[in-house]
Design a protein with these regions (language model features):
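A late C-terminal transmembrane helix in Major Facilitator Superfamily
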Residues: 340-377
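Helix-loop-helix hairpin linking two adjacent transmembrane segments in secondary transporters
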Residues: 93-95, 134-187
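Intracellular juxtamembrane helix-capping segments at the cytosolic ends
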Residues: 109-123, 329-344
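Conserved MFS/SLC helix-loop-helix module at the cytosolic interface between two early adjacent transmembrane helices
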Residues: 55-94
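Helix-to-loop junctions at the C-terminal end of transmembrane segments
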Residues: 56-68, 265-278, 303-304, 374
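Cytoplasmic helix-loop-helix junction between adjacent transmembrane helices
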Residues: 99-137
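Extracytoplasmic gate region of multi-pass secondary transporters
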Residues: 24-25, 211-256
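C-terminal ends and interior cores of transmembrane alpha-helices
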Residues: 78-91, 288-310
Length: 415
């Protein structure tokens, strides 16, 4: 297996799915504007995406090694390419739900395959963490690009126009190119060494990993982190539009700062973690997240007389709040890497299945809860609520670290 070509292939997959997955914030805003749906209804898009990820991961994670990671990647890419090309033709909110369900289904295949391939390409914990952060950093570069790609298709003079749906023709073409590249890259199929135990047994094997207290605290931490990230990230464009009073296209463009900060943070984390212990590093990030929200939200009281015609006219809070992404950045890939690097490669698909499931559940609940609070009490209250899970993450990681130090050998038991 050519290591560099394989890294390029999985990075390309992650890039195109980054654009699609994290467009949900933009699509929520545009669905409210174009299809005249409520914030609560719009928040269900996250559920169609994330619950599809959870459902598919729950039932196929342990089977992907059998069909091969290359086949799984190609299947996911082709599925989404087809649905993207159909979306502008239907141009209805119900089909947007279908689109995100397809995106979630495909990403379950892609993420499990990518994480498992990272394990094959890494020889130790340091190389695993470094490659994980690099790939996740490229993912965030895709997210950053997505905001500008989508904003380029929005008519600032008529935000309710359906013209923005034409972006899916471009994305369908990009995904097709990615699928062709992955198909021709020589990715070796890892020999399946497990016993032929059947579907139910393999499914239960994955669930048995959660019996270990260390793994249980890990998945709780993942759930809470994604709850915060998706709650803020998915609703930041709407926050910019309705709380800060920015135009639709500028609201979306400024959200790219959030993605840029996460991309920068994840790329830098690979270097900084060579010198700083992971637990100290994560807690420092969580404290800075807490302070950013606490100090920035009072600044979002913007005068109604303020007129914004460009990104440089936006109030200071529009730049400071997305900066929280810099401190969020390393947390998700780092805690994933800590667990995955301690497991044998044959268990990576099962553990990644749990990661995907709890990430999806956290994202769904976070976006829905934020949408409901936003609808009933306003955007400021919705974002203040994220302080609670941030504190909960600190406690869960404290227990996780203690269990890791005392019973690290627990992770290597077969499941």
């Amino acid at each position: 297996m050519n290591r560099m070509l394989t890294i390029i292939a999985i990075s390309l997959c992650y890039f195109v799915f980054a654009v699609l997955l994290n467009s949900v914030g933009t699509v929520i805003l545009q669905s409210i504007t174009t299809f005249d749906v409520s914030k609560t209804d719009a928040s269900t898009l996250e559920g169609f995406k994330d619950l599809s990820i959870a459902f598919v991961s729950f039932f196929i994670a342990s089977f992907i090694p059998r069909i091969g990671y290359q086949v799984a990647l190609c299947l996911g890419l082709v599925l989404v390419a087809v649905v993207c090309l159909l979306t502008p033709m239907f141009a209805e909110f119900y089909f947007i739900k279908v689109l995100f369900a397809a995106i979630g289904t495909a990403f379950a295949l892609v993420k499990i395959s990518v994480y498992s391939l990272i394990g094959q390409l890494s020889s130790n914990t340091k190389t695993h963490s470094s490659l994980m952060n690099t790939v996740e950093g490229i993912f965030m570069v895709g997210v950053l690009s997505g905001y500008w790609i989508f904003s380029g298709f929005i008519d600032p003079n008529d935000p309710a126009s359906l013209a923005w749906l034409n972006v899916y023709y471009l994305l369908g073409g990009m995904i097709t190119i990615a699928a062709i590249f992955v198909y021709f890259v020589p990715i070796e199929r890892e020999p399946f060494t497990g016993a032929q135990t059947g579907a139910l047994s393999e499914f239960l094997d994955m669930l048995k990993l959660t019996y270990q207290p260390l793994v249980l605290m890990f998945v709780i931490s993942v759930f809470l982190y994604v709850l915060v990230e998706q709650g803020i990230g998915s609703w930041l464009p709407t926050f910019n539009r309705e709380v800060l009073g920015l135009p639709v296209d500028i609201s979306i463009q400024l959200t790219s700062i959030f993605a840029a900060m996460i991309a920068i943070g994840r790329l830098l984390a690979g270097f900084l973690l060579r010198f700083v212990p992971w637990y100290i590093f994560i807690n420092g990030c969580l404290v800075m997240m807490f302070l950013t929200i606490l100090l920035t939200l009072p600044m979002t009281q913007v005068s109604e007389s303020q007129v914004v015609t460009g990104i440089f006219d936006a109030p200071l809070a529009a730049y400071l709040l997305p900066a929280i992404g810099l401190f969020m950045a390393p947390i998700y890939p780092l805690i994933n890497s800590v667990v995955l690097s301690a497991l044998p490669n044959k268990q990576h698909a099962k553990m990644t299945g749990l990661i995907v499931i709890f990430s999806a559940l956290g994202g769904t609940f976070g976006s829905f809860l934020t949408g409901v609070i936003f609808d009933k009490f306003g955007g400021q209250h919705a974002f203040y609520m994220s302080l609670i899970p941030i504190v909960m993450i600190m406690f869960s990681l404290f227990i996780f670290k203690k269990l890791s130090a005392n019973r690290r050998s627990t992770l290597v038991k077969g499941a």
